[in-house]
């Protein structure tokens, strides 16, 4: 009977939710077409981005943001606003904020020929397939401008060149000159320089890094962008979006007209992702005001410039899914780079990653011009990549004299914590074993914990030679992180007369707290049991349980673990 009542209540709540949604606009899940988004769906107005651009008018603007933060929709907004067409596209803006800004801004509406390319779906396994996709994209953009076929101002040769690329027939050299050619033809036809918009320009570059055709794609993109964006007399303005700046690869070599807006810059900081006000307005519209705190805990936490930002993809999916929280963002694309980082990380970096998993901040040098190969070649570049790709947030920024930054970074929210846990455990193929270890900790079964730890180390650690106590500390932090929904996990904090290794502070009253102390030796003659007993004695002598007791935790389990190579001995106090 209780189950039947609960089920009826769930059905009733779901029905109320669906009826409420039926009265309101639909949520734009996966909609990147501006006209469609503004006419048939709930649209968060980002049109003041146009005002900010026209106030400064940099020749070429590059916006670097994580995936699924509204880049494609914003670029299509720019296309619809600026593009000269037979349709009166001002109707899409007259009820938007940009239209209230005055004639200085609105006079630009519908006045420019526009070239628009998005590389977001160029994800092939070989260079040959990648080039075919790029050539097809170029061909489709030429076809979109079929007014050039009947243009009275183009020469026969220019029309021949148009048909070559429109017909998907050009070779690599022809396609590399595609932007330059199309901008020339449009300038000549309309009598006005054109705007070039390139969305997700670095998607095929990341794919090239992953699938070993990196030199080919970088060489192609360098020539492609140089022809269209560098010293091009047919260019009015250019816009690019991507995850990385990729400056060091000379893709934008010598392009002095390029202005980059990264996640650390104040410019355009509120236009990619949702602000707090925008999220609250959306929740109010759908009658879900009471869900703000939960939504914030899961999907807030990003900081672009000085603006606090929510993940827009996850916010929309959360509200659409009857406000049931889960990791929506992790299913939007591959996380191979995270796995690559975990596989190649040094023991020190592994320990830092586990600290992040436990909710701690770490200090990191951030280079927003990080490139994909550096993830393998320079281990400390991983924090730069994780930050710009959306896997970390900035807590504090300390500008450096070389133009880069020292930052305190942390995992932004619950959703990204799930992504880390999934990738960490999947990469070691030890998901179920790690869960068993966490269960052994929770059930205080030291014999089982000892056996599982040794099994885990044998199966998941390729080389233990030279590992120090910090390595095992980091490994244990990661395993304890699975208990994060039951415990607040602290590491290397002062308590009593010293600093404990790991503390598990229960989130629910009445549950036991845990103190861990680790010892390590390389000496084959050292008795691990005696070493583990020494760890327990240290917990007692140093009064590491002081903080737990001060917080009202009465049941405290002390665990001492001694490591040597892939062996462990566990003692419980």
Indicate residue ranges for each PLM-predicted region.
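Short, conserved active-site loop motifs that form the nucleotide-linked donor/cofactor pocket
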Residues: 7, 114, 556
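Acidic active-site catalytic centers that drive phospho-/nucleotidyl reactions
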Residues: 6, 40, 199-202, 501, ...
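Structural signature of nuclease core domains in nucleic-acid processing machines
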Residues: 446-573
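Conserved catalytic motifs of the protein kinase core domain
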Residues: 6, 112, 193, 499, ...
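Short, conserved glycine- and acidic-residue-centered signature motifs
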Residues: 3, 217, 531, 535
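Exposed loop/turn and edge beta-strand positions of beta-sandwich/beta-sheet ligand-binding modules
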Residues: 5, 57, 496-498
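Single conserved hydrophobic/aromatic residue that forms the stacking wall/gate
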Residues: 1-13
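Phosphate-binding site recognition
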Residues: 14-470, 482-487
